[in-house]
């Protein structure tokens, strides 16, 4: 089948849910037996989000092939079976970089390089390249219609219909129908104006996804259809859901996937949404109640920084038929106030990744508390490194143990810069990134959780466990349960005399899905349940 293209745009406000809409539509089309791929186009000039502050951008999602990408790719992978790559996310910066490189090589034969056709053609090439082998390619255009930055992207997707025809392209516009409390009314004017902006560019949306906090009455759908020039059946309300995993079911109930395959002339089987119904049932009505897990981090004021992590913990709850309640604790606050009171009612503690010295001593204090009070502990990336620092200081009595990331003249750097990173000067795209194999020691907590000896997980870091301290740490009870054999790097550490204590250098959250929870999160949440019931 010739690949069909679905372009998803957003209007009125940012963060309107285009990524979730794209991911949910992908899940529905997969349920109909179609091969789906997804792609995110970002209008910013950065080459990728790898060097952007978590407070500005939120989480950086890492693919298996080592791309640092937008967090929406996390939604795509969690909701679908698509294996995404570097091709699945591109930015204005990447496009201009590529076009300028071609111009310097003389590829344009002395022509004047312009936004149209050169920039837009480059964008179209990247979209087509990513779509190879798929029945349907869902392409989300970042930003909001009306932004200057988005114009070249919108022009590129406009040309797709000219190039490929109406039967092979579809425009879905996500918009807002706000409720004005003082007037007691829903308002359609923002949606009308957003569609007007799209039509000025030359794009007539085929389907409108109308976000609202309340049900949209039929007469209002009729009004939107009339003023926006779409069939009333294609005005699809998307009322705020209790949980994001209900969105595919809500969109199916409104027959979004039915309208999409009809407009694209695709014959498919009826969708089987039983797995999604089971997920929603567990999330909304868990059989084993609730566990409370503390996330002790440094970016807690913007929880989007830990998006994949919070979702992976939810998946662990789904696997154990319980709800996971998260308490975000600022590690700097622990440094200022002390640990007392912060973790006393928690069933488990997780210390996530991060960069820089700020807040790290608070993380060490939280780890020591979890170790001494036998509370299940999970350390990821920097969290694993701080667990090694804590163990070296308080169990091995290496008082000045630290990471060379924070103290260059550190007397005992139990965590140090990786050898291949010592000659690196540029920040962007130069970390240890993507999937690497790891061998697990038989009988360890990690081995039991995975039920496998060989695994592969995704990484994003420059610093690693210092092998010079292997002997003293293992002699004092630290278990090195996961090793990257090619370079003899320690990837997983554990403690034996503890209910559940594990640190990993990789990011397991990037591979967890609601329909396939990650083994470590399943095991960790199970330990939290046991801890809760033992209290």
Curated annotation (Swiss-Prot):
Pathway: Pyrimidine metabolism; CTP biosynthesis via de novo pathway; CTP from UDP: step 2/2. UTP binds at residues 14, 187-192, 223. Mg(2+) binds at residues 72, 140. NCBIfam families: PRK05380.1, PyrG. One of its GO terms (biological process) is 'de novo' CTP biosynthetic process. The active site is at 381 (nucleophile), 507, 509. L-glutamine binds at residues 354, 382-385, 405, 462. Its EC number is 6.3.4.2. The lineage of its organism: Bacteria, Pseudomonadati, Thermodesulfobacteriota, Desulfuromonadia, Desulfuromonadales. Belongs to the CTP synthase family. SUPFAM superfamilies: Class I glutamine amidotransferase-like, P-loop containing nucleoside triphosphate hydrolases. Allosterically activated by GTP, when glutamine is the substrate; GTP has no effect on the reaction when ammonia is the substrate. The allosteric effector GTP functions by stabilizing the protein conformation that binds the tetrahedral intermediate(s) formed during glutamine hydrolysis. Inhibited by the product CTP, via allosteric rather than competitive inhibition. Keywords: ATP-binding, Glutamine amidotransferase, Ligase, Magnesium, Metal-binding, Nucleotide-binding, Pyrimidine biosynthesis. It comes from Pelobacter propionicus (strain DSM 2379 / NBRC 103807 / OttBd1). Homotetramer. It catalyses: UTP + L-glutamine + ATP + H2O = CTP + L-glutamate + ADP + phosphate + 2 H(+); L-glutamine + H2O = L-glutamate + NH4(+); UTP + NH4(+) + ATP = CTP + ADP + phosphate + 2 H(+). Residues 1-266 are annotated as: Amidoligase domain. Catalyzes the ATP-dependent amination of UTP to CTP with either L-glutamine or ammonia as the source of nitrogen. Regulates intracellular CTP levels through interactions with the four ribonucleotide triphosphates. ATP binds at residues 15-20, 72. CTPSs have evolved a hybrid strategy for distinguishing between UTP and CTP. The overlapping regions of the product feedback inhibitory and substrate sites recognize a common feature in both compounds, the triphosphate moiety. To differentiate isosteric substrate and product pyrimidine rings, an additional pocket far from the expected kinase/ligase catalytic site, specifically recognizes the cytosine and ribose portions of the product inhibitor. Signal peptide: none annotated. It holds the Pfam family CTP_synth_N. GO terms for cellular component: cytosol. CDD domains: CTPS_N, GATase1_CTP_Synthase. Residues 292-534 form the Glutamine amidotransferase type-1 domain. This is CTP synthase. One of its GO terms (molecular function) is CTP synthase activity.
């Amino acid at each position: 089948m010739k690949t069909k293209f679905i372009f998803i745009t957003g209007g009125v406000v940012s963060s309107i849910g285009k990524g979730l809409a794209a991911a949910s539509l992908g899940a529905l089309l997969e349920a109909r037996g179609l091969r789906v791929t997804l792609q995110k186009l970002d209008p910013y000039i950065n080459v990728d989000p790898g060097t952007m502050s978590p407070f500005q951008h939120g989480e950086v999602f890492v693919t298996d092939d080592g791309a640092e990408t937008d967090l929406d790719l996390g939604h795509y992978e969690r909701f679908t079976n698509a294996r995404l790559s570097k091709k699945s996310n591109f930015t204005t910066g990447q496009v201009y970089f590529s076009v300028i490189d071609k111009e310097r090589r003389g590829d344009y034969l002395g022509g004047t390089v312009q936004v149209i056709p050169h920039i837009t053609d480059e964008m179209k090439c990247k979209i087509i390249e990513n779509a190879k082998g798929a029945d349907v390619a869902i392409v989300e255009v970042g930003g909001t219609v009306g932004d200057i930055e988005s114009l070249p992207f919108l022009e590129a997707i406009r040309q797709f219909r000219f190039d490929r025809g109406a039967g092979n392209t579809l425009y879905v516009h996500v918009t807002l129908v706000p409720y004005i409390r003082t007037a007691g009314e829903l308002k359609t004017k923002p949606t009308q104006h957003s569609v007007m902006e799209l039509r000025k560019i030359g794009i007539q949306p085929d389907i409108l996804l109308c976000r609202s906090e309340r049900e949209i009455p039929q007469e209002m759908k009729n009004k939107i259809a009339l003023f926006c020039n779409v069939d009333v059946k294609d005005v699809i309300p998307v009322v705020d859901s209790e949980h994001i995993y209900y969105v595919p079911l809500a969109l199916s109930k409104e027959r979004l996937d039915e309208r999409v395959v009809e407009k694209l002339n695709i014959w498919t089987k009826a969708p089987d949404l039983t797995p999604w119904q089971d997920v929603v049932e567990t999330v909304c009505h868990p059989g084993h109640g609730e566990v409370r897990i503390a996330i002790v981090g440094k970016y807690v004021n913007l929880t989007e920084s830990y998006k994949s992590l919070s979702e992976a913990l939810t998946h662990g709850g789904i696997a154990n038929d319980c709800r996971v309640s998260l308490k975000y604790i600022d590690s700097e606050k622990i440094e200022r106030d002390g640990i007392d009171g912060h973790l006393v009612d928690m069933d488990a503690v997780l210390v996530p990744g991060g960069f820089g010295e700020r807040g790290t001593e608070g993380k060490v204090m939280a780890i020591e508390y979890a170790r001494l009070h036998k509370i299940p502990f999970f350390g990821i990336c920097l969290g694993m490194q701080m667990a090694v620092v804590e163990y070296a200081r308080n169990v091995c009595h290496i008082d000045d143990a630290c990471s060379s990331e924070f103290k260059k003249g550190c007397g005992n750097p139990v965590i140090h810069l990786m050898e291949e990173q010592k000659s690196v000067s540029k920040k962007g795209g130069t970390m240890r990134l993507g999937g690497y194999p790891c061998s697990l020691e038989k009988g360890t907590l990690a081995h039991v959780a995975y039920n496998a000896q060989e695994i592969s997980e995704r990484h994003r870091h420059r610093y690693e466990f210092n092998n010079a301290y292997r002997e003293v740490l293992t002699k004092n009870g630290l278990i090195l349960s996961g090793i990257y054999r090619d370079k003899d790097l320690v990837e997983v550490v554990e403690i034996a005399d503890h209910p559940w204590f594990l640190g990993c250098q990789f990011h397991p959250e990037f591979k967890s899905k609601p329909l396939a929870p990650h083994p470590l999160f399943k095991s960790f949440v199970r330990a939290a349940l046991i801890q809760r019931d033992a209290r």
